[in-house]
Amino acid sequence: MGTHEYEDDPRNSEVIISINGELLHRSEAKVSVFDAGFLLGDGVWESFRLHNGHLIFIDEHIERLFHGAETISMDIGKSKEEILSEIHRVIDANKMFDDVHVRLIVSRGLKPTPYQAPWVISSPPTIVIIPEYKKANVDRARDGITLVSVSTIRGGQNIQDPRINSLSKHNCIAA
């Protein structure tokens, strides 16, 4: 049990997702196996909540997204205003207002072949926006959680800067 638990919501089966500005039913939303995010974990992400019609701390999240992209020498290819506009468009398409978690993912884009060099890209960045209804698990909120320590630790800033929400989260998963 952890802090990321939420109550299942049947509306999520009908959620509309934005991929590069195209609105798709969740069952139709797909990203290429040649996407740098899939091949290499090459990209950045942010997640934030929609509460009573307001995107909580959205300016800070967008700023961190762009800072993370700049840190890994990735040009998002859109302005902050364009990204924010698309977030609102997908939320509006889903008629969402409250208890919503939004995941914004930006990868470096498509690669012509599985190759590590970040400059070998054949498309603009891939931008995915996934909004879902996620209300906190009331039992967990009431009962709290149990803290567990493990021997695997995350590396320091010289290994992977913890201030960047990088798609490559293996060090966090292992920890």
Regions found by a protein language model. Name each.
Residues 1-175:
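Conserved alpha/beta cores of soluble small-molecule-handling proteins
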